[in-house]
Amino acid sequence: MNPKTVCISGVSKGLGHALSIEFDQRGWQVAGCARTTSALVKLGSQLSNPHFFQSVDITNLKEVITFSEEVIENLGTPTLVVNNAGKINSNARLHKVSEDEFLEVFKVNVCGTHNMIKAFLPKMEGLSQGMIVNFSSYWGQSTAAEVAPYCASKWAIEGLTRALAQELPSNLSTVALNPGVIDTDMLRSCFGDAAGSHEKPEDWAKHAVDCLENLSKSDNGTTVIA
């Protein structure tokens, strides 16, 4: 993919933050968004290649479209879009999850992904090749008690990705990405301190970027494990 420009959602912490640093270290231009401006400023100070970060609520389509336009103005059209931003519900049996919390999980994980695709896909159609990566989970193909909203949202991402793959022009591809079990704030919200025994985001990012850099048209519509 050339030029090497990646756009990642949810870069203020966790996997998105680690991916941004790893891609930069490999010579990529990095664009990214999150809600926390101070975290974006700090991340930008850690990168050496051209980059562009903006505070964006990915559940707001107008904000995402504006962001996509400014990414292209500053760095050009990304050849790789990574829909990483995600949210998990607080551990609770399904009937005790509030309507607001249930909807918020879907708004971020599913609608936010749709908004990013809606904003960037038309612009990527002019590329010689491009890839859209939608973050799934082990819970996108399995289930667990007390995280039903999150499981449902990731099953939705799996279906969305496979359907999108059938619609894309021949120069574009999409995959669902299962990152495995990584020690992030999200995992700690479920597992508590036990999450600390799992791989750290910065270590995961090294082999995850290896995976992402080697994706090809033959992967279109599949779920890959990084």
Label each residue range with its predicted role.
Residues 12-13:
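Conserved glycine-rich cofactor-binding loop
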Residues 26-42:
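Conserved glycine-rich Rossmann-like NAD(P)H-binding loop of the short-chain dehydrogenase/reductase
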Residues 55-66, 99:
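The beta1-alpha1 cofactor-binding region of Rossmann-like NAD(H)/NADP(H)-dependent oxidoreductases
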Residues 92-94, 101-103:
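Substrate-binding pocket helix/loop in short-chain dehydrogenase/reductase
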Residues 117, 153:
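Active-site helix of classical SDR
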Residues 137:
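Residue(s) in the substrate-gating loop at a strand-loop-helix junction
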Residues 170-172, 176-177, 182-184, 193-226:
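C-terminal helical subdomain
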